[in-house]
Amino acid sequence: MLYYLFEYWENKYDLLGAGVFQYISFRAGMAAFVSLLIALVFGKKIITFIQNKQIGESIRDLGLAGQMEKKGTPTMGGLMIILCIIVPTVLFAKLTNVYIVLLLISTIWLGFIGFMDDYIKVFKKNKEGLQGKFKIIGQVSLGLIVGLTLLYNSSVVIREYTLADGSKSTIQSSSVYTDVESSLTTIPFLKNNELDYGSISCLITDNCTPILYVLLVIIVITAVSNGANITDGIDGLAAGTSAIIALTLSIFAYVSGNAIFASYLNIMYIPNSGELVIFGAALMGACIGFLWFNSYPAQVFMGDTGSLALGGVIAVMALAVRKELLLPALCGIFLIENLSVIMQVSYFKYTKKKYGEGRRIFKMSPLHHHYQKSGFHESKIVTRFWIVGILLAILSLATLKLR
């Protein structure tokens, strides 16, 4: 919104300083600042409003240290996160950019699914929340929208350079280029690190690229959003981890959306993707601002309203910058938490069937509860998980050069 206003003032009145809004770095910095400001100024008021509506967390006694003290803590704090994402993005991003539109839709879409889940838990006194099938339907529907848009929208392109022998390359090696719609993505750590989903689909059957790609998008969005949801089990873990991931994806978006940096790093140039930095900055600011109130001891929980939205937009952002195959590393905390639940449940069922009694791999799942049961304090678990998250982020950024 402000981008267009200041562009108009610059063109119409030659307003001094208006041109600064042309710079992605400035708008990203302002988006992060405003996002943090909204959280710090309005956060307490939002928490008070939630408390007045008696929207408190109901706690099931799992025998964890300090667990029952959290009973009644306001939940649905994800509304604060969503507000802190949407307002700065609308103010500072180009609202005609297809990637920004997709991410705003994803934020609201998954936020609504999470809100309905929290609403049923709190007001209908149903601990199961929204039925799993409805969550899946919502995530699959969003996956269809995102997948088809990324595949067929004319603004979603990569730059292909024409070499002297007539061959094509995404690495800048000539001054002759065309921006083309493509299903290319990148594979981390490989020298020739480009993968065309179209070439995989040809091994299965002809003309099945759209089906394969959309299916992948659905899986990625569902897996990452559910991973963030499972990770949100102790104070500050999901918010802090998401902030680290948001910063990393913003860096990927910046270098991929800048022709000079893309050429220097020998990576795929993705026109229009630089605008994702503004959204990523707002996302990071929202997570850090939320941490002000969610760090131990938490004054508010994000609930599914926040966790599903966070995981979903992280997935969509990674798909937009064609780094979805890097997500197992970048979102390693989400992955480990998810796997710990799958392993625990599967092993319990297997041993119960084979030996007549269920056995466990971990003292409790997800993994953060295992460490709680082992006597570690919440703050220590969260801090160490953040450190691992930072290491994974650095490893992910290293793929820009290590291949």
Swiss-Prot record:
Annotated TM spans: 30-50, 73-93, 95-115, 136-156, 210-230, 242-262, 273-293, 300-320, 325-345, 380-400
Entry similarity comment: Belongs to the glycosyltransferase 4 family. MraY subfamily.
Subcellular localization, as worded in the UniProt entry: Cell inner membrane
Pathway given in the UniProt record: Cell wall biogenesis; peptidoglycan biosynthesis
Bilayer disposition of the protein: Multi-pass membrane protein
Recorded GO MF terms: metal ion binding; phospho-N-acetylmuramoyl-pentapeptide-transferase activity; UDP-N-acetylmuramoyl-L-alanyl-D-glutamyl-meso-2,6-diaminopimelyl-D-alanyl-D-alanine:undecaprenyl-phosphate transferase activity
Cofactor(s) the protein needs: Mg(2+)
GO biological process: cell division; cell wall organization; peptidoglycan biosynthetic process; regulation of cell shape
InterPro entries: Glycosyl_transferase_4, PNAcMuramoyl-5peptid_Trfase, PNAcMuramoyl-5peptid_Trfase_CS
NCBIfam families associated with the record: mraY
Protein name: Phospho-N-acetylmuramoyl-pentapeptide-transferase
Pfam families membership: Glycos_transf_4, MraY_sig1
Keyword Methyltransferase in annotation: no
Any one GO CC term of the record: plasma membrane
Superkingdom of origin organism: Bacteria
Stored HAMAP family: MraY
Keywords, ordered alphabetically: Cell cycle, Cell division, Cell inner membrane, Cell membrane, Cell shape, Cell wall biogenesis/degradation, Magnesium, Membrane, Metal-binding, Peptidoglycan synthesis, Transferase, Transmembrane, Transmembrane helix
Broad class of where this protein is predominantly found: membrane
Enzyme class, spelled out: transferase
Job of this protein: Catalyzes the initial step of the lipid cycle reactions in the biosynthesis of the cell wall peptidoglycan: transfers peptidoglycan precursor phospho-MurNAc-pentapeptide from UDP-MurNAc-pentapeptide onto the lipid carrier undecaprenyl phosphate, yielding undecaprenyl-pyrophosphoryl-MurNAc-pentapeptide, known as lipid I.
Known catalytic reactions: UDP-N-acetyl-alpha-D-muramoyl-L-alanyl-gamma-D-glutamyl-meso-2,6-diaminopimeloyl-D-alanyl-D-alanine + di-trans,octa-cis-undecaprenyl phosphate = di-trans,octa-cis-undecaprenyl diphospho-N-acetyl-alpha-D-muramoyl-L-alanyl-D-glutamyl-meso-2,6-diaminopimeloyl-D-alanyl-D-alanine + UMP
Keyword RNA-binding: no
EC number: 2.7.8.13
